[in-house]
Each structure stands twice: as C-alpha cells, then as structure tokens.
C-alpha cells in the first residue's frame, strides 16, 4: 500500500497500526495538503458485502460527532476493492504504550485522562453512538496530555444492528464486557465496563482478568471477581477504588448508567481525595468487609460472598446444603481451604463445568459464551413486543422479572405499546433480572439532521439510513467548505422526515479559480513591480540577472508568465544587475569594421586611454570593438571611438574614421 494514492487524493506514506479488522496508515491528503490517518479494511472482510455496508454506514454515522476528545472522521470511501475511512491524524502515543512505559499512572493523571475519556463517551452516547471497543490501544495521548479516543468508525450506532454478525471477533478479550462475551445486546453501559477496565489498568499497570486464551479471559469477565485495585496499588484512594469496581460490575444495572454520572463521580473523587495512609488502622467485622467489597452495599439475588468477594451461589460448594439452609461461610478447623485456595478451586470448577456443559458458541454473532441453560434459577423473558405497557409489565412480573421503561420513542407501532426490550424475548436470564423496554410514543415523524460539512458519501449514507432518497446534487464553489463536502441541503435541518422523501444536496467544488491578466511591470523597480503584482492577486518570485547596460540596472527586464492566467499564480520578474565585465556572446562582423550603434562595447581592461574624439558620438562605451580582418585584436592596441560611431582596431592602437 505504501505509495498508493487512494481516490486520486490520499497518498499512503507509512503503516502506523494494525487492528482486528483494519490496517491504519499515515497518509497525505494531497487536496488539502495535510496529514491524515487512513484506516483500510482488511482483505478478508472486503468479501463480506454486509460487513462492508455496515462498516461504511457506521463510520458515516460516527462522522457526525465532533468533539475535542474524539478523533474526527473526515471521509468514507472506496477505491476498487479497498474500503477505507479517513481520520484526523494525531501525533502522540497510545495510552497502552504509556502504561507499558510507566507501569501504573499517578493519581492526578488518572483523573485527568479518565475525565477526558468520559467526556468523549458522554458526547458519543448522547449522539446515539456506542463505541464497543474501548481499550487503551484506541486512546491517543498527545504531547500536551490531550486525550483523543479513536475507532468510532467501526462502532455501532445504538439504534442499528451490530456489525459483529460476521463470525469475526471484533475487539480485545481483555476489555470485553460480560454482555459482549455472552452475545447479549449492548448499550452505552458496555462502554462504561470497558472504561472501568482501562481505569483499572491505569491505576495498577495490569488488567484485572488475564489468561492464555481469549476464551479463558472471557470466562473470567463473566464469572470471576476482580482483585480490588488498591490491593495491587496501596496508593489508590478508597473512593477511586470503589468507582473502578462499580464500573466493572457484572450486571449493567449495577454500573454507572451513563458517562455523565462518571464525570460527576470523578469530580467527587478528585475534590475529596484523601490518601489511605492518613486513615487510622481499624478492625472490621465480616459484614463491613462485605460492604466495602460491594460498591452498591447490597447482595445480588444470585450472588453470595466469601471474604467479601462474590461467587455464583449455584456453583458446587464444598459441603452439600439443604435447599433452605443458609450458606456456610464460617471456616472450621485447620483442614479447611484458605480463602484463596477455595477461590482457585471454585474458579477451576466453574471453568470445567462451562467448558464441558456449554456449546462454546465462539462467535461474536452469538456471543463467546451463551448463558448456561441448565441453571435452575434461569427464566425466559416473555414475548412482550407489541403488547400494551400494562400487559407487558404483567407478563414480565409473572415471570419473576422486573419491568422498567427506559424511553418513549417515535415509532410506527401503536402508541403505548412495547417497541423493543432488553434482554431480548426468549432470552434465559436470572430470576429478578430487570427487563428494560422502549414504549412507542405513536409519533413517527423524525427531524432531519444537519448534513452540512459532511462528505458527500457520508451525507448519502445518512439520507439512506433515514429511509429517504437523494434528489438533485449540484456543485458550487465555496471558500469555506472543503471540496466534496455538503454546502447546503433541502429540506433544511430540523424539517420533518417522511419515509421516501427526496433530499437535495449542494456539494462544494472548493474555492473558485479566478483568472486575470498579468499586469506588465517592465522597467519598474523590484519593489514597485512586486506591489503591482501582489495587488492584482498574484504571487511574486524575484530573480536577478547580470547586464552590461547600466540603464537596465535595478529594473524589471523580464517577466513571465504573462497574459490571462489563474489568480494566485506566481509571476517571476527578473531584475537587471549592472556588471561591466559580463561576458557577451561573440559577434559575427566578419571583419567589416562596422557595428550597430545599439550594441555594447567591451572596454579594454589593459589600458585606460580609450576615448571618443571631439565631435564623435558619446555612445562609444555601448558599442562593440570591431576586430581586424584576421579576427584578433593585437596585444597592447588602443581603442579610440570615431565620430561616426564605428570603432576599428588597428595594430598600432589608433582609431581611424
């Protein structure tokens, strides 16, 4: 790819990164003369038409968002079978590289970086974009400590289907949320989980879950409790420790519900920072330990705690218990396993049971691991889409689940009926799980967003996304809008959208190229000529040239180009510089003794007695010597100008008329 020019515009210069789905190159935008980053979809994905379509559509959706902490997307396109996204080029390091170089990051920078990342997520989420692959590899840090989150180009617009139905694993197992690992539909809270993992890594220098294979890592996300970060780094304040643990809660409803809540919490952590060393040593009973370990200070109905760490109560215990018997947490005798040993044993049993009993549906379409259908506490989400809100609530509660209305959305479905639900219908979930639904508001009209400033391809993709058609596309010159981007649209932003409606676009041709006649500046001084040309809208390039005519010294003797040319063209002017010793071309007088009066004479540098006789022309210094018939000037000969303006050389050095 190096040296390739995509779409006659983006010249690939060097490879700067490789991801799961694409290769990223540094390139030169030859139109705007700036460096950009070009993400090229890997060849194995280009064969999947559905993937390519969604890749472009989601990148176009992400191009709508412009934020100081998000890498801007400039263009989406294809050149032959090469599909690419053009992004802002950021000079700096990835957060992953900084962590590798420094280990853990100090407290103030953690808060600073986390705040900027949360601002980026908050902005994207408010615009309907879920990243789904937040990890330090996708977070750039400039030399000025400005955070730039990248890779929104392959993110999922939250109201659209996911692009992960391609049986290709997208993302990194170390940062996957439990719901991603299980193939459950995701929302903005999956980004909050991944953000928590990044926060954990910044604070400790390590990820909370690691193993030899992605499968094993995914299992840990689903089943294992993370080691509290302040056990790995004693300098982490309790408030930050709790915040990290809440971000990485297994259940989305137990996490922060949006990035704005995270921003508030970060502000509190920063303003109320107290080093743990300043606290008095205290003795805590088991209940206190349990409450410290659970940021929400409550037991989930499917969790039990051992030394403050949650385990699934449905997994085998060391001793069988009666159905209604309380868990036996009390350690008796010296032959009992220690807390750490028991944790290792339980974890190993979990792995064995899941590996043996599950189908290991290893694809991102169906999830890395499906929930264990053999669990006695699982229930199915009832079919409620299309039901009224009250009927849906009744069915959900009859199934021993909880009902929550998330939003009322514009939909073609009857007003007051369920449009979507999460988890999906027929999904097996734990008893008591919250089923979140969207209810139809009955209003199907949507408003048209602004397409101004978008590349034409991105604008077309958005129009198609809204179920509309592209109407007339005209082009106009613009000094403000880059070539190929939208200048205006009709109907305008805020107009109500009706399915099938036509939207017209005006596309920029870039700045208008205007022509003008180059003014003649022959005979002008350098400053005067430059001023005249610049005022006429031209650039100026000044050169000097030796001349033997003193009258040409310091003035324009040549000018090019001339005539009718593009405004802004650089005009070269040549300024004469008098040099009496400048070499002249050889003459061709053939010894006839006569020269044109306008020609120049090269003075004899060996004698100073050259002079014009009385009554002769005084122009003899501008005339050329005439050589004797044999083409040579005798040594020591003098040159004397004659009255008729002709000069001849004689052997004895006397001039003759």
From Swiss-Prot:
Residues 10-274 form the Protein kinase domain. Residues 288-298 have a biased composition (Polar residues). SUPFAM superfamilies: Protein kinase-like (PK-like). The keyword Kinase applies. It is an enzyme of class 2 (transferase). Keywords: ATP-binding, Kinase, Nucleotide-binding, Repeat, Serine/threonine-protein kinase, Transferase. ATP binds at residues 16-24, 39. It catalyses: L-seryl-[protein] + ATP = O-phospho-L-seryl-[protein] + ADP + H(+); L-threonyl-[protein] + ATP = O-phospho-L-threonyl-[protein] + ADP + H(+). Its EC number is 2.7.11.1. This is Probable serine/threonine-protein kinase CA_C1728. It comes from Clostridium acetobutylicum (strain ATCC 824 / DSM 792 / JCM 1419 / IAM 19013 / LMG 5710 / NBRC 13948 / NRRL B-527 / VKM B-1787 / 2291 / W).
